[in-house]
């Protein structure tokens, strides 16, 4: 047996976070247990869990402090409420049948325990660590989470300590608000008026980037830290270099022109995927985007069917969305140029995943009101809007 469990519980400085391994005495967990007892580390000295002095639980459990213990006051929080909490959680797990009595002499547990140096309330330290340990044991022996849960939740979750959400594009359709006005104060003001939504993307347009460079991404994050930000570079050369520049600036996606050499597009997509950002291929003035897709080694994450500002009076060019998705079923299709409220049903009906809207929102007299109208037209609820959530 070799099972892994994790749980976080509580709040404030007394918050408990427990990582643990459960396994056979003769296996890797048993070896880790023995090593922990015999190879001590300054500030992270392992200790046996005990319900009270002279009463350890079964299976035997080794506690390892995650945070360096620097003085006896901090040591008392481990050698006390945390030590007892972990032990009682193990004993209760046996009593409740989570751990079989037949296994208690065959397996051991190694638990890493987080105690913040500022934690003061021993009652909370005990209760939070008891709950976290018990939950971690149950999860470990129950195989939680399964891979389907991981994949479903990975794009929804915000790490409690990190404090902000990294947005990914997994639940279309989306509204992408494009800012071409090269005035950062105007852009920041307009972004602050756009309603917060799981289905809004912010685009740093080409003129904006030409004026301010990659630093404009940080300026946008000052207003909307968790925004999904597209850097519309319309790359034509040095694709890998420009993709790395966007990634280093904490952008989420880079736009490459479909007019670029195939080798440039390939290098940009490869570098984007290497650095964890999205690659968007813009078809502005490219008469045959399908042929470009067929020549690529790796598909972009998004293809943008784009009608330029200077030619927006002509009919839209969204008719080949179905053909694109036959070639690349997982690709997201964005439509840009001439997207008005009355055109939203048409675009969505033809299979568009992202609606790119610029001046219709950014130059309107009431940015918030118009943006809300576009968001509502997507007919898409917020992710987990009706979910009452503790941990799951």
Swiss-Prot record:
Keyword Transmembrane helix: no
UniProt entry keywords in alphabetical sequence: Carbohydrate metabolism, Lyase, Multifunctional enzyme
Annotated segments matching region Formaldehyde-activating enzyme: 1-161
Residue positions binding substrate: 19, 48, 66, 68, 83
Signal sequence range: none
The enzyme's E.C. designation: 4.2.1.147, 4.1.2.43
Database matches in Gene3D superfamilies: Aldolase class I (3.20.20.70), Formaldehyde-activating enzyme (3.30.230.60)
NCBIfam families: one_C_fae, PRK13307.1
Record's protein name: Bifunctional enzyme Fae/Hps
């Amino acid at each position: 047996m070799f099972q892994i469990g994790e749980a976080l519980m509580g709040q404030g400085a007394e918050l408990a976070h427990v990582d643990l391994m459960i396994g056979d005495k003769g296996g890797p967990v048993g070896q880790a247990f023995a090593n922990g007892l015999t190879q001590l580390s300054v500030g992270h000295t392992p200790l046996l869990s005990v319900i009270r002095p002279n009463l350890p639980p079964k299976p035997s459990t080794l506690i390892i402090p995650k945070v360096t213990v620097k003085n006896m006051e901090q040591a008392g929080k481990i050698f006390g409420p945390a030590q007892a909490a972990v032990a009682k959680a193990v004993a209760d797990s046996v009593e409740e049948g989570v751990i079989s009595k037949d296994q208690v002499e065959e397996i051991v547990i190694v638990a890493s325990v987080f105690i913040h140096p500022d934690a003061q309330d021993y009652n909370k330290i005990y209760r939070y660590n008891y709950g976290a340990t018990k939950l971690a044991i149950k999860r470990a022996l129950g195989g939680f989470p399964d891979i389907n849960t991981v994949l479903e939740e990975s794009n929804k979750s915000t790490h409690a300590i990190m404090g902000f959400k990294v947005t990914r594009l997994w639940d279309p359709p989306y509204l992408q608000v494009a800012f071409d006005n090269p005035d950062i104060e105007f852009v920041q003001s307009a972004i602050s008026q756009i309603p917060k939504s799981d289905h809004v993307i912010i685009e740093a347009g080409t003129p904006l980037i030409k004026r301010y460079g990659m630093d404009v991404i940080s300026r946008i994050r000052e207003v909307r830290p968790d925004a999904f930000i597209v850097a519309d570079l319309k790359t034509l050369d040095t694709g890998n270099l420009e993709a790395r520049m966007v990634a280093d600036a904490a952008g989420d996606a880079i736009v490459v022109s479909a007019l670029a050499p195939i080798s440039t597009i390939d290098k940009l997509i490869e570098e984007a995927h290497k650095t964890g950002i999205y690659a968007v291929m813009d078809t502005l003035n490219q008469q045959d985007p399908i042929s470009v897709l067929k020549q690529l080694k790796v598909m972009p994450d998004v293809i943008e069917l784009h009608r330029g500002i200077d030619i927006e009076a002509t009919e839209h060019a969204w008719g080949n969305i179905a053909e694109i998705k036959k070639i690349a079923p997982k690709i997201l299709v964005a439509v840009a140029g001439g997207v008005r409220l009355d055109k939203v049903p048409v675009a969505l009906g033809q299979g568009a995943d992202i609606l790119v809207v610029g001046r219709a929102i950014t130059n309107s007299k009431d940015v918030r009101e118009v943006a809300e109208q576009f968001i509502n037209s997507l007919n898409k609820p917020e992710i987990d809007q009706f979910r009452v959530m503790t941990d799951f």
